[in-house]
């Protein structure tokens, strides 16, 4: 999140045609809930374009990149690596340690699509489970980011937005942002 050590989400194992919507939602969730960047492994140019379009319209900063070497990103990461998996340690048991690690350096969050190679489990500093039950990787990422930032990301100011959502009790309203 802007003003803190970098948080990057790595979408590992994107399968074209099968994972387009889910990969897009991983990126949009990362953006909305405080990450600085998403790196997508695989041929996901449609997801990249959609996430960039939302960032252009609703603000950032947020970066999207495609990578052909995701395992090198994990291996060479100069910070804490967190792998979200239902088999990991309970989030409530490790979240304070991860927040402490984030206070002193960047965090890479690995979110798998297909079966994650075992070396990712071994290279991760933390394998973290959100409920240790099968569910959506998007839900796991959202809960993890909220726990990492302790809700601070919900009050974030969006830079360079063309439009903004106006909160309403009922109905919906999106309005242009006036540059002053």
UniProtKB/Swiss-Prot annotation:
Keyword line: Cytoplasm, Methyltransferase, S-adenosyl-L-methionine, Transferase, tRNA processing
InterPro entries on file: Alpha/beta_knot_MTases, tRNA_m1G_MTases_N, tRNA_mtfrase_aTrm56
Location(s) in or outside the cell: Cytoplasm
GO MF entries: tRNA (cytidine(56)-2'-O)-methyltransferase activity
CDD domains for this protein: aTrm56-like
Gene3D superfamilies: 3.40.1280.10
Gene Ontology annotations for the cellular component aspect, listed alphabetically: cytoplasm
Binding site for S-adenosyl-L-methionine: 84, 112-116
Pfam families named among the record's database cross-references: Trm56
Enzyme Commission numbers on file: 2.1.1.206
Main localization, broad class: cytoplasm
Reactions catalysed, as given in the entry: cytidine(56) in tRNA + S-adenosyl-L-methionine = 2'-O-methylcytidine(56) in tRNA + S-adenosyl-L-homocysteine + H(+)
GO biological process: tRNA nucleoside ribose methylation
Function description: Specifically catalyzes the AdoMet-dependent 2'-O-ribose methylation of cytidine at position 56 in tRNAs.
Subunit structure: Homodimer.
Family, per entry: Belongs to the aTrm56 family.
Listed name of the protein: tRNA (cytidine(56)-2'-O)-methyltransferase
Taxonomic source organism: Natronomonas pharaonis (strain ATCC 35678 / DSM 2160 / CIP 103997 / JCM 8858 / NBRC 14720 / NCIMB 2260 / Gabara)
Organism lineage: Archaea, Methanobacteriati, Methanobacteriota, Stenosarchaea group, Halobacteria
